């Protein structure tokens, strides 16, 4: 029998709430004990709740609930769980190169790897156990950022040995996801329609006036100044001029959209609640709602494997999907 964590849908929903500051301290449902313990090795961990996925060279690395870290060397067909020194919920993972990677999550946890995700060590000092980190980004093996709830924004220039708190001058909004564009710009999406843009590697940030006041869960940078942002209640907006002006898209549904991806062939796919996907073949000018038959679970993120397939992570763990 497949063993699933109890109330999987509820845990998935709590991550949504984490990114919209509706749970406050209830989100830190773990404790110092859970943070300090090693993750339990579960034979079917790839079927548990997973919240983010990244590429590590030719491999894929996914992270999620109970400190689970999974590595796939065959494009997401099979997964191997890596030992992790925490049982906290992990919400973000990033690899600037095939060997160096970081994952972050609840209870102020920051983990690092130098072998492509096979082994991990703690980098946080345990003093921020009440922090909820939601995403991580690294330019290279030395310079990176961690962002999260209540305006948490940490920076490092020594590979995570030390972290410095910064404030991009917006207040204590929840920062949900940080993304790099093809021109080197950084995009930081958050609650209250927040989209911050940096053109200097993250030292300074400018707020884009997005005509939407709900939470944004991500930004998908395109070529030549194009950006797509997405979030609550099916909201999708597109800019052609680095965020100066925005055009909303009618998604025909009110589902929450959590992840976005542009494939090598140019197809854009956004994924969210209930197995709802939004596809665009014209650089985000128009979207078509698509529901894969038999796929009814919620998606937190998605990535293109080297063989051109799409691997999703979310409520049902890691799942390869076949696009129409």
Residue ranges of predicted features:
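Bacterial N-terminal signal peptides
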Residues: 18-30
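Residue-level hotspots at or immediately adjacent to binding/recognition sites across diverse folds
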Residues: 2, 33-324
């Amino acid at each position: 029998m497949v063993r699933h964590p109890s109330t999987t849908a509820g845990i998935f929903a709590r991550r949504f709430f984490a990114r919209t500051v509706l749970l406050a301290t209830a989100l830190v449902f773990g404790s110092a004990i859970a943070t300090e313990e090693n993750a339990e090795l579960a034979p079917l961990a790839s079927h548990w709740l997973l919240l983010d996925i990244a590429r590590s060279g030719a491999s894929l690395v996914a992270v999620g609930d109970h400190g689970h870290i999974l590595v796939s060397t065959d494009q997401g067909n099979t997964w191997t769980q890596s030992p992790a020194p925490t049982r906290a919920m992990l919400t973000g993972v990033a690899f600037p190169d095939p060997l160096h990677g970081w994952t972050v999550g609840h209870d102020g946890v920051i983990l690092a790897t130098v072998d492509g995700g096979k082994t991990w060590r703690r980098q946080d000092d345990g003093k921020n156990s009440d922090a909820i980190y939601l995403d991580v980004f690294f330019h290279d093996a030395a310079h990176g950022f961690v962002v999260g709830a209540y305006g948490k924004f940490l920076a490092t220039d020594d590979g995570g040995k030390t972290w410095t708190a910064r404030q991009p001058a917006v207040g204590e909004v929840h920062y949900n996801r940080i993304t790099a564009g093809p021109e080197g710009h950084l995009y930081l999406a958050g609650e209250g329609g927040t989209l911050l843009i940096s053109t200097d590697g993250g030292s300074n940030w400018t707020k884009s006036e997005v005509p939407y006041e709900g939470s944004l869960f991500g930004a998908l940078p395109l070529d030549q100044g194009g950006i797509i942002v997405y979030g609550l209640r099916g909201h999708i907006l597109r800019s052609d001029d680095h965020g100066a002006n925005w055009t909303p898209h009618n998604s025909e549904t009110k589902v929450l959209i959590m992840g976005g991806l542009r494939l090598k062939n140019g197809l854009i796919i956004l994924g969210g609640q209930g197995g709802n996907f939004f596809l665009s073949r014209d650089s985000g000018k128009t979207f078509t709602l698509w529901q894969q038959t038999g796929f009814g679970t919620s998606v937190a993120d998605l990535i293109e494997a080297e063989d051109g397939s799409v691997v999703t992570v979310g409520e049902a763990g890691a799942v390869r999907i076949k696009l129409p």
